[in-house]
Amino acid sequence: MATRIPFDESYWEEYLSGQEASLPALPAVTQLSPRVTRLLAGNPGIMQLQGTNTYLVGTGPARILIDTGEGRPVWHATLAEHLRTHHLTLEYILLTHWHGDHTGGIPDLIAHDPTLQSRIYKHHPDRGQRPIRDGQRFTVTGATVRAVFTPGHAIDHMCFLIEEEKALLTGDNVLGHGFAIVQDLAEYMASLARMAALGCERGYPAHGAVIENLPAKMQLYIHHNEVRVQQVITALASVVKLPGKRVGMTVPEIGRAIYGEVPREIVENAIVPFLSQVLWKLAEDRKVGFEPGEANKRRWFGLVTQQ
């Protein structure tokens, strides 16, 4: 498994705030299809876009809830009012992954109805929760939801396929706007390929607007990552070879080869973390090697020949 590189949110705050300001507004509650209702979690932010999307799935009185937001009172009040008004109950609570903006609403749910504790499912369950198996199905009137294990954004990330719609709840792996933050690039790219192979037409992301053309969005995400991987391979292949000596490049040197001379702050806070993810993925694929040393002084070299 590739080394996980932390994302420096503070460095990107100004840029991300600008992105947030340009996002389309989403209503607090929206009926997206005959069997899918979106409830915003009331937590807009630079990483959450318009807020975390939580979903009620099904057409009968018992519904499946996907994710719980981060624990804002407005979300719990909205959910409770919606359930009361439409005479609904929660049969299953499925969590896409462990991040707090998806699991933070659990205490309020349990406080309201302690019996819900035994209906909470997560791939790596916390105490009192139940595990989700890859391929496991959850059925209520009007909807069958199948779990698809898709690690990368998080180690326990799950997507959920609604079989009646050929629609995919994409979690944080694919967003309605922009691109996702990745914990493990190798796992993430494998998960993107698996998600694309499902052949779903519509995407319900955990953040942002509905993805009406999911195949096109999947190809965009896959291409986005493939281009950046190829840039690193090309940069390493450009190193002049010396007879009898293995010559490599440090991560900052690779960054300069790809992006030119940029401010040191950008190199340290953005370029180095991202390129490190790419390099560890390529090392797993046996396309690059490295010499031992400190992270930014370690020299990397290609093991493949450019065509």
UniProtKB/Swiss-Prot annotation:
It comes from Penicillium aethiopicum. Zn(2+) 2 binds at D101, H102. Its cofactor is Zn(2+). Keywords: Hydrolase, Metal-binding, Zinc. Its EC number is 3.1.-.-. The active site is at D101. It is an enzyme of class 3 (hydrolase). This is Lactamase-like protein vrtG. PANTHER family: ENDORIBONUCLEASE LACTB2 (PTHR23131), LACTAMASE-LIKE PROTEIN APTB-RELATED (PTHR23131:SF2). It holds the Pfam family Lactamase_B. It comes from the Eukaryota. Coiled coil: none annotated.
